[in-house]
Amino acid sequence: MIIVTGAAGFIGSNLVKALNNLGRSDIIAVDDLTDGTKMFNLADCEIADYLDKADFIEQIAQGQFDGKVEVIFHQGACSSTTEWDGKFMMANNYEYSKTLLHFCERNGSQFIYASSASVYGGSDKFIEQRELEKPLNVYAYSKFLFDQYVRQHNFTTQVAGLRYFNVYGPREQHKGGMASVAFHFNNQIKASGICRLFQGHDGFEDGKQLRDFVYVEDVVKVNLWLWQNPGISGVYNCGTGQAQSFNDVANAVIAYHGKGEIEYIPFPDKLKGAYQSYTQADLTQLRAAGYTQAFKTVEEGVPEYLDWLAAQHFIGQ
């Protein structure tokens, strides 16, 4: 069987759907549905069972899954970069991940997990090297620490981590303020015809802060490729390799709707010193490992995403 943690979340649910498209429904979906609206992400998916994340880790400890699991796609985490409860973050992200990793090692199961580009923090280079990793918040630190743990041990099973850059696309609507700018810009254009972007900061002009915006479909493809290549382990960047500006995203949304304009708002004081103004994945190691597929640009991915959003009807919309 296949286990997907964070299965009702953004990337996890896209992964479940992609596995369904490959003919797999022997999937245990693990999540926390305290936010019941996340069920929409699984409503069109086929799974064998659903387990709350606390019940799942208990059953792992009891040995109920021993010898039964082909792969764990560990996508579940507290992903809020504004959460500063370190004790909670370490238990939820770091210790939980270690428990699943050691289960996979004992059982010979593949372990493919979500890391994050946030581990690079204020760095201006994004290469999988220790000296470039400078986390700026406790979420990033929890991800960094687990990557370090993986690096320090020689596991006999596949252990592969993907440092996601700025992922956007279908099934992120439950994330609220943490959803992508593509999602928010789309809502803003529909509501008022105006996209609101931050003014210049940190040496960047208005709206010209640069991020590596990567479409969720492409992120899922890298996960599936790792699963299909169990001999590949390590920690890899997962982005397009090409930074684009927030203006690019706003203009893609405006072009899609055929209307709209951009308004620049003051850069928030609370984000100063804790904000990545530039990210761009260095894909050298991923390419060297054998991944050859192309990644969609903002101009390609955003219209596809907005087509999907236009066809959805979520609670509150």
Curated annotation (Swiss-Prot):
Query: What CDD domains does the entry give?
Result: ADP_GME_SDR_e
Q: Which organism is it from?
A: Shewanella loihica (strain ATCC BAA-1088 / PV-4)
Gene, per the UniProt record? hldD
Which EC class does it fall in?
isomerase
Against Pfam families, the record matches this protein to: Epimerase (PF01370)
**HAMAP family tied to this protein:** Heptose_epimerase
- Its recorded name reads ADP-L-glycero-D-manno-heptose-6-epimerase
Q: Which cofactor does it need?
A: NADP(+)
Binding of NADP(+), residues: 10-11, 31-32, 38, 53, 75-79, 92, 143, 167, 175
List ligand-binding residues for substrate.
Answer: 166, 177, 184, 198-201, 211, 275
Q: What is its EC number?
A: 5.1.3.20
Which reaction is this enzyme known to catalyze? ADP-D-glycero-beta-D-manno-heptose = ADP-L-glycero-beta-D-manno-heptose
Domain remark from Swiss-Prot or TrEMBL: Contains a large N-terminal NADP-binding domain, and a smaller C-terminal substrate-binding domain.
